[in-house]
């Protein structure tokens, strides 16, 4: 996605793995009083601490001294709802309340950050039972509490058994293996454009029951998507409409 849609000469992009779920983020934000902060400084300090706690990840954030060194912040997390058990003391309502608070807080990438949610998990990026464009994608739902079993479901039901249809390979040095054939590059980019379009349309369907590209992007804001997922899918029948956040990010980032 970076190679295909962003400035490939830009060396100022920072990608950091949080290494936990969205509810852990909420807990850490409470501990660091991030919710009471007026800018992104507290969040960056939190991420720095998490980075130091996971030495296997990059330490690139340690080089930052001030929050104003970062112009935009995007956060991507899975919905990842869980039934209460010995390992999770939060009720379903409490988990939903925390997600809603996070979506309200992270609503501007140029301020404190912009949060995007994958439903139910990031693996939804390849949940297509038919080749693109999958005309049935609008109606795909899964149990809201599917948890890690969704990965197995994607492997079993998706017509794409890997990410090759939208991704380049990686060599031993973790560098992109850019195809030599321009047609292959164009095919991957075209697939991304299709994936973006059908996720935009599905987000619109979730929010207003119209499988079409909305005239206003605000209609399919992350807050509206979440509220309608609960009202139309989770609360009535314990299901969630499959939707991926990365195509929606592309849509909003380019304003088209």
Segments (PLM) and residue ranges:
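Short, extreme N-terminal leader segments that mark the start of a protein/domain
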Residues: 1-24
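C-terminal accessory helical subdomains adjacent to catalytic cores in phosphodiester-
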Residues: 13-16, 26-35, 41, 51-256
């Amino acid at each position: 996605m970076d190679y295909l849609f962003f400035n490939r000469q830009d060396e100022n992009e920072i990608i950091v793995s949080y290494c936990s779920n969205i509810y852990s983020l909420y807990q850490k934000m409470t501990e660091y009083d991030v919710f009471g902060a007026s800018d992104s400084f507290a969040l960056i300090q939190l991420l720095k601490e998490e980075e130091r706690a996971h030495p296997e990840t990059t330490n690139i954030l340690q080089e930052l001294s001030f929050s104003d060194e970062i112009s935009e912040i995007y956060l991507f997390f899975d919905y990842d709802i869980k039934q209460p058990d010995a390992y999770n003391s939060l009720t379903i309502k409490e988990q939903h309340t925390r997600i809603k608070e996070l979506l309200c807080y992270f609503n501007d990438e140029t301020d404190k950050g912009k949060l995007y949610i994958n439903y139910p998990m990031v693996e939804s990026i390849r949940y297509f039972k038919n080749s693109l464009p999958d005309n049935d994608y609008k109606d795909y739902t899964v149990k809201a509490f599917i948890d890690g079993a969704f990965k197995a479901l994607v492997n079993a039901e998706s017509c794409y058994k890997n990410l090759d249809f939208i991704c380049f390979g990686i060599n031993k040095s973790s560098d992109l293996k850019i195809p030599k054939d321009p047609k292959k590059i164009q095919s991957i980019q075209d697939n991304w454009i299709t994936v973006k379009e059908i996720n935009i349309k599905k987000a619109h369907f979730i929010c207003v029951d119209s499988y079409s590209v909305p005239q206003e992007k605000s209609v399919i804001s992350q807050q509206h998507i979440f509220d309608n997922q609960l009202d139309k899918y989770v609360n009535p029948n314990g299901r969630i409409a499959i939707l991926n956040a990365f195509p929606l990010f592309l849509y909003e980032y380019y304003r088209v």
